[in-house]
């Protein structure tokens, strides 16, 4: 998992409440057992004019010109600005996979669905909760200025405009912050203790060989 320390990027405004996980990545794309390749199908039903299916050549599909992510001014956006209760609906880890593989590193909203919020941290995507008033202000700024950018400083727990004129502090649990700063997912955290795990396994086999299908002589 990539480290998240400080990130500066273009902001894309998704001005919708209650965006559910089926909108983020529709159910037909959940058949894949791989963790990659979901980016082209993020927001598939809003992003394209036709019905998407796994295995399609997305480069040949007709784009919806009215969808925000298809507008030229938001191309290359890496910070998603949206409204309350983002990520609601059924639990699917494919949702943060799709957003991250699209290119987003952070999502700013007044609130998130709990399971989606937790899944974001496990996959290196930073969900940031700001007040509705702060989010409203950021929407106004994003609409007003082409290529509007923000800097997300996880170490200092602050979102700021690139000129440094405005700052928005945010909260994040210390353990989640530690994992993102160091690029640790669940597997990475476990592997940090690989020596102790091997030592435990060796001692367990010696003391309880029957648990390792070894004959006791």
From Swiss-Prot:
Protein name: 3-isopropylmalate dehydratase small subunit
Pathway listed: Amino-acid biosynthesis; L-leucine biosynthesis; L-leucine from 3-methyl-2-oxobutanoate: step 2/4
GO cellular component: 3-isopropylmalate dehydratase complex
Enzyme Commission designation: 4.2.1.33
GO biological-process terms attached to the record: L-leucine biosynthetic process
Xref: NCBIfam families: leuD, PRK01641.1
Function per UniProt: Catalyzes the isomerization between 2-isopropylmalate and 3-isopropylmalate, via the formation of 2-isopropylmaleate.
Reaction catalysis annotation: (2R,3S)-3-isopropylmalate = (2S)-2-isopropylmalate
Keywords for this protein: Amino-acid biosynthesis, Branched-chain amino acid biosynthesis, Leucine biosynthesis, Lyase
Subunit field text: Heterodimer of LeuC and LeuD.
SUPFAM superfamilies: LeuD/IlvD-like
PANTHER family cross-referenced by the UniProt entry: 3-ISOPROPYLMALATE DEHYDRATASE SMALL SUBUNIT (PTHR43345:SF5), 3-ISOPROPYLMALATE DEHYDRATASE SMALL SUBUNIT 2-RELATED-RELATED (PTHR43345)
Gene: leuD
Similarity field: Belongs to the LeuD family. LeuD type 1 subfamily.
InterPro entries recorded: 3-IsopropMal_deHydase_ssu (IPR004431), Aconitase/3IPM_dehydase_swvl (IPR015928), AconitaseA/IPMdHydase_ssu_swvl (IPR000573), IPMI_Swivel (IPR033940), LeuD (IPR050075)
GO function terms (MF aspect): 3-isopropylmalate dehydratase activity
Domain of life: Bacteria
HAMAP family attached to this UniProt entry: LeuD_type1 (MF_01031)
Disulphide connectivity of cysteines: none
